[in-house]
């Protein structure tokens, strides 16, 4: 009997590792506490259509990741997004064009992880609470008390604070991961029946509770029935308002949006708030991945590198590479 490899987390990092291991002929089984894959790369279904509440776009600087992105493009899962960009600084809104190539999933961000997952076995709505090792193999315990296993190795591909709670069997790794701080982000979606009279499709914001905003419908193949906008608050504002109600957050960020935009803003016909508790690492690390190869446990995620989508993908590749290297 072939004992599969367990991978906890179906964001970009976990699926990147899963793809690399599957390509090398290994069996994997994925676990995720959510109802679908993607993590911060997921799109939220709503009455206003699919909304990219998390990652807004991504860039490809590393040659290996750029190759993967070109494959996704050829398969029809991603497209370039060329928004009319603005910058808001010192109370002034000004055009801010650049040469950066930006990619988005189509018809939503979750198209990418859905394609990466393919037909790999996965247990959704399954929150793993404990990872423990028997004499030969690993087993996982979920929040319902159900046991999963045996597994030959475990890869934990979650935000650092969630990973550290699963590393009781690997105290050295646990202490490193426990030192990683991640910043929160409040995200708000607003939809308007009458399109806002502005050419702006994306905006980097300074001196405001907002950090970024985007016209969701300006992305390729998005639903354009309503004029949908995604607002991201700064890490600082999000931390200060971590426990605010969704209604309070929507009201405050809607107000900040109205202050900076250079047109009349009607009342939205739809609004939604989502709190990303672990949106991005507070500092940069250059680990690639973390591992205790003798134990057979590996940790990866965007926080092991740049905090970007590319960093998550590269971290998953590195975790898989280390695991395969140890098997040789």
Curated annotation (Swiss-Prot):
Its cofactor is FAD. The keyword tRNA-binding does not apply. The keyword NADP applies. FAD binds at residues 13, 32-33, 40, 56-57, 128, 302, 309. Coiled coil: none annotated. Keywords: FAD, Flavoprotein, NAD, NADP, Nucleotide-binding, Oxidoreductase. Substrate binds at residues 57-61, 96-98, 185, 308. GO terms for molecular function: flavin adenine dinucleotide binding; NAD binding; NADP binding; oxidoreductase activity, acting on NAD(P)H, oxygen as acceptor. Pfam families: Amino_oxidase, NAD_binding_8. It catalyses: 1,2-dihydro-beta-NAD + O2 + H(+) = H2O2 + NAD(+); 1,2-dihydro-beta-NADP + O2 + H(+) = H2O2 + NADP(+); 1,6-dihydro-beta-NADP + O2 + H(+) = H2O2 + NADP(+); 1,6-dihydro-beta-NAD + O2 + H(+) = H2O2 + NAD(+). Its EC number is 1.6.3.5. Catalyzes the oxidation of the 1,2-dihydro- and 1,6-dihydro- isomeric forms of beta-NAD(P) back to beta-NAD(P)+. Has a preference for 1,2-dihydro-beta-NAD as substrate. May serve to protect primary metabolism dehydrogenases from inhibition by the 1,2-dihydro- and 1,6-dihydro-beta-NAD(P) isomers. Belongs to the bacterial renalase family. This is Renalase.
């Amino acid at each position: 009997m072939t004992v599969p490899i367990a991978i906890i987390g179906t964001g970009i990092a976990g699926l990147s590792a899963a793809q690399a291991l599957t390509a090398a002929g290994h069996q994997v089984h994925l676990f995720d506490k959510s109802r679908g894959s993607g993590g911060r790369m997921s799109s939220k279904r709503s009455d206003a259509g699919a909304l990219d509440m998390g990652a807004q776009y991504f860039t490809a600087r590393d040659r290996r990741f750029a190759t993967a992105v070109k494959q996704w493009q050829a398969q029809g899962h991603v497209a370039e997004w060329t928004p009319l960009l603005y910058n808001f600084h010192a109370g002034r809104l000004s055009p801010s064009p650049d040469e950066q190539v930006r990619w988005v999933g189509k018809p939503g961000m979750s198209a990418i992880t859905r394609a990466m997952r393919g037909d790999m076995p996965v247990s959704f709505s399954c929150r793993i609470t404990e990872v423990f090792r028997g004499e030969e193999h690993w087993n996982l315990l979920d929040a319902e008390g159900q046991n999963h296993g045996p597994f030959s190795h475990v890869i934990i591909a979650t935000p650092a604070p969630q990973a550290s709670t699963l590393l009781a069997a690997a105290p050295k790794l646990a202490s490193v991961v426990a030192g990683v701080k991640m910043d929160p982000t409040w995200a708000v979606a607003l939809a308007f029946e009458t399109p806002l009279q502005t050419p702006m499709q994306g905006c980097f914001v300074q001196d405001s509770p907002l950090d970024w905003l985007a016209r969701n419908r300006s992305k390729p193949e998005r639903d354009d029935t309503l004029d949908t906008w995604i607002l991201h608050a700064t890490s600082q504002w999000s931390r200060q308002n971590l426990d605010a109600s969704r209604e309070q957050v929507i009201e405050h960020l809607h107000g900040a949006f109205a202050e900076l935009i250079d047109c009349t803003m009607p009342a939205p016909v739809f609004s939604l708030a989502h709190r990303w508790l672990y949106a991005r690492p507070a500092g940069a690390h250059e680990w690639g991945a973390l591992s205790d190869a003798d134990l057979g446990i590996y940790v990866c995620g965007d926080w092991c590198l740049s905090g970007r989508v590319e960093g998550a993908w590269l971290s998953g590749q590195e975790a898989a590479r280390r695991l395969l290297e140890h098997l040789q």
